[in-house]
Amino acid sequence: MQTTYLPDVDSLVIPSRHGIHQVIKANLKNLSNMETDVKQIRISDYNYPLPDEKIAKFPLAKRDESKLLIYNHGKIEEDIFHNISSHLPKGAMMVFNNTKVIQARLHFRKDTGALIEIFLLEPHTPADYEQMFQTTRECSWLCIVGNLKKWKGQELKREVNIKGICVTLRANYVEEHHTSHLIRFSWDGDKVSFADILEAMGELPIPPYLNRETQESDKTTYQTVYSKIKGSVAAPTAGLHFTDSVLSDLDNHGIDREEITLHVGAGTFKPVKSEEIGGHDMHSEFICVHRSTLENDCKTIAVGTTSVRTIESLYYLGLKLHADKEIEESKLHIEQWEPYDENQPKLKPQEAINAILDYMSAKRISTIHFSTQIIIVPGYDYKIVKMLVTNFHQPQSTLLLLVSAFVNGDWKSIYDYALSHEFRFLSYGDSS
């Protein structure tokens, strides 16, 4: 048995873009009865009935009119999302994930009539996201391939008109790459970038649990109003409720706004198939954080689970850099179970952040890039995040475990209330 003390934490949880929001203020307690080995957590203990009619298939007409559930020391109340600033402490820092969803689904029709879908996961050559979208003539991606057996290795072709130019996109299978496939794309013309290709030919991926085809409206509604950096294949949906008006209210309320970039991968939809969480392989995601965010020492409010994973990963990144100041930036990575290693050094959160700032000063960089595989489950000791805005998540998901860890296991009362009070769930649902 281990005793883990979680600091006084206010949690604001806002589910997704068009439904009900939830603000959680949770005073996390001493977890004296927590299992030493968090890997033994049974995912079946985090199940709940979610009828299909509770899943929001489309957003509300106005983003900020979704419901907001507020949880404060076991007390639950409701509001509308556009009033969120009134529930936040002045002088806090709210962290947003500014990633932008790309049109990652490409469809090719073989001469035989077979339809092949190529779902872009992660850039391979070039590996840098910004360079990838600017590249011309050729690039390679790690992908999921639908109907792979029907491909049989032939070159796939598809023509499209871009900027008045007839462009033929060619796709060639290279090799299997762990759980994905390496695909090389090529096309003629120095004036057509891969970003142009996706804009003209790609389809926006929406969550599979919506059980519908992507519509033209999703190109707008499945992006946050502050999205900037292309790279995600799924939206950071806690941010979908924010409007320019809400952001202005936050500014007027004295809330500092900072942005990080975490490109959300398809792994966010990966179900937990093992009985115990220790058997689940958490997906890895790439992160970019600016120096200004690290220098802001205000109380931290995370918008969404991607922001939580980013911010909490910073603590463990600081531990690494405190121990070894010469690590190459390309090798900076947080392993899945790293936070639960009781033998690692202990630093105060600000000391860990200072180690990152010192590293950045020595390297003369204004942003730091790294990847994280961190999994946050009950028993996790939150280091930096004090409030959380998030969605209502799927049963038996790693995201639900993250929320449970944040509210000291009281997730059932929150979700029972939401289910019985007409809250809308998942990506286009409400917020908490």
Task: List where the protein language model places each region.
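Short helix-onset patch at the extreme N-terminus, typifying the N->h transition
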Residues: 7-8, 45
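Short hydrophobic targeting helices and cationic amphipathic motifs
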Residues: 6, 22, 28-31
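Ser/Thr/Pro/Gly-rich low-complexity, intrinsically disordered segments
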Residues: 11-13
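Surface-exposed, charge/polar-rich loops and edge strands
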Residues: 28-432
